[in-house]
UniProtKB/Swiss-Prot annotation:
Keywords, in A-Z order: Amidation, Antibiotic, Antimicrobial, Cytolysis, Fungicide, Hemolysis, Membrane, Secreted, Target cell membrane, Target membrane
Keyword Secreted: yes
Name of the protein in question: Panurgin 1
Keyword Membrane: yes
Disulfide feature: none
Impact upon substituting residue 6 to L: Increased hemolytic activity
GO cellular component: extracellular region; membrane; other organism cell membrane
Length: 12
């Protein structure tokens, strides 16, 4: 999974 994009989506 692309955690960089996921975390950026969760932590705005």
């Amino acid at each position: 999974l692309n955690w960089g994009a996921i975390l950026k989506h969760i932590i705005k």
